[in-house]
């Protein structure tokens, strides 16, 4: 008998992979190899292999046994949780243990699984919504609270969320007998098979309402506009999302509302530039201040600061102000000013005075540099 391939290798993941990573890997492979989506002759066998690996690794109990005992545990009925049969992990010829390709595939991609809200009369959360907001650069430094009118769904108070005029108006669906789904024969690669589809009479709810609530018209929920405070955290990065729970679409069958994701966009500042959690700014310095070593005022997002200029400073030199950058939970950035020397506009009188004064200065900077360059052979 051929040795089974390692389940982690089949899904292309490490042993340290978490539940989310396992599911993501399965989804990708299922999209590629599912017989309904692939024309490859090997896709059917490959999909069996993928299903087997996912069925084990997605179950914490089965995964723990597999990690400790390997494939042999599959052939031992004494290992609880594997439901092992005489052919290893069940009869793959009929897909009895895994419900065929579709049992797991449809969990991800829709279809006849009970996980789908269209096919289930169980509580199901509403759809999540998204929107966006623009804030200034300084708002992203300090954070901001925005008051905004938002729509939120709540149970209709007139019918207590039943959608019916009265309790006596709620009947079990006569078509599906309360299941929310009906079975029909469909053509497949394996011939005609039974497929569970949403009951068209009750739309998967399992109930019929003879007289709808006059307030919500049978929707069970009503939409109200409320003033909501949205907290934008200090240090927010442009494109980052803020979550508001319960401000999405209405839940199904008593399920919770969906959520609202607010994507925050930060407008550019004409002078400040963000790099990671630091703030950079080109800072002009007059050569007069440089020569006289005068103190100058530096603007920061937290207020003005003073520094004393030294004649030893170089053009493009960076001076750091600790803790004056972005402040987030795990890190505090700095403000970094890049010195840019500038010559002020002197009046004619000042220029003459400077010329007279500087002519007496022994300035050999240019000559010294030329000599250094020419001395190199």
UniProtKB/Swiss-Prot annotation:
Its cofactor is Zn(2+). Keywords: Chaperone, Cytoplasm, DNA replication, Metal-binding, Repeat, Stress response, Zinc, Zinc-finger. Zn(2+) 1 binds at residues 156, 159, 213, 216. Zn(2+) 2 binds at residues 173, 176, 199, 202. One of its GO terms (biological process) is response to heat. One of its GO terms (cellular component) is cytoplasm. It is found in: Cytoplasm. CXXCXGXG motif repeats lie at residues 156-163, 173-180, 199-206, 213-220. A zinc finger (CR-type) spans 143-225. Signal peptide: none annotated. The J domain is necessary and sufficient to stimulate DnaK ATPase activity. Zinc center 1 plays an important role in the autonomous, DnaK-independent chaperone activity of DnaJ. Zinc center 2 is essential for interaction with DnaK and for DnaJ activity. Homodimer. Belongs to the DnaJ family. Participates actively in the response to hyperosmotic and heat shock by preventing the aggregation of stress-denatured proteins and by disaggregating proteins, also in an autonomous, DnaK-independent fashion. Unfolded proteins bind initially to DnaJ; upon interaction with the DnaJ-bound protein, DnaK hydrolyzes its bound ATP, resulting in the formation of a stable complex. GrpE releases ADP from DnaK; ATP binding to DnaK triggers the release of the substrate protein, thus completing the reaction cycle. This is Chaperone protein DnaJ.
């Amino acid at each position: 008998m051929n040795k089974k391939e390692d389940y982690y290798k089949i899904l292309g993941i490490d042993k340290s992979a978490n539940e989310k990573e396992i599911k993501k890997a399965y989804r990708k492979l299922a999209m590629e190899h599912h017989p309904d989506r692939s024309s490859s002759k090997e896709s059917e066998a490959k999909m069996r292999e993928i299903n087997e690996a996912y069925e084990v690794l997605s179950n914490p109990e089965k995964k723990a046994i597999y990690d400790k005992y390997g494939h042999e545990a599959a052939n031992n009925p004494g290992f609880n949780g594997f439901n092992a049969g005489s052919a290893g992990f069940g009869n793959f010829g009929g897909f009895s243990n895994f419900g065929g390709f579709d049992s797991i595939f449809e969990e991800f991609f829709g279809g006849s699984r009970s996980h789908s809200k269209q096919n289930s009369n169980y509580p199901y959360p509403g759809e999540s919504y998204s929107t966006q907001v623009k804030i200034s650069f300084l708002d992203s430094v300090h954070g901001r609270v925005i008051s905004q009118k938002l729509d939120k769904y709540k149970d209709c108070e007139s019918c207590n969320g039943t959608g019916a005029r009265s309790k006596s108006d709620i009947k079990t669906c006569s078509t599906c007998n309360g299941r929310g789904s009906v079975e029909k024969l469909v053509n497949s690669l394996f011939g005609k098979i039974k497929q569970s589809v949403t009951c068209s009479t009750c739309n998967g709810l399992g109930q019929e309402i003879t007289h709808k609530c006059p307030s919500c018209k049978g929707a069970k929920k009503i939409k109200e506009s409320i003033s909501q405070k949205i907290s934008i955290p200090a240090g927010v990065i442009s494109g980052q999302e803020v979550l508001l729970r319960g401000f999405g679409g209405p839940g199904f069958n008593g399920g919770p509302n969906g959520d609202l994701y607010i994507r925050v966009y930060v407008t550019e500042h004409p002078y400040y530039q963000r790099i990671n959690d630091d703030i950079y700014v080109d800072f002009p310095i007059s050569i007069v201040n440089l020569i006289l070593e005068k103190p100058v005022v530096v603007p920061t997002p937290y207020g003005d600061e003073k520094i004393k200029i030294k004649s030893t400073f170089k053009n493009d030199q960076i001076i750091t102000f600790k803790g004056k950058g972005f402040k987030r939970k795990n890190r505090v950035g700095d403000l970094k000013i890049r010195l840019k020397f500038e010559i002020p506009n002197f009046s004619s009188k000042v220029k003459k005075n400077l010329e007279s004064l500087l002519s007496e200065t022994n300035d050999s900077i240019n000559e010294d540099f030329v000599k250094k360059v020419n001395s190199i052979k």
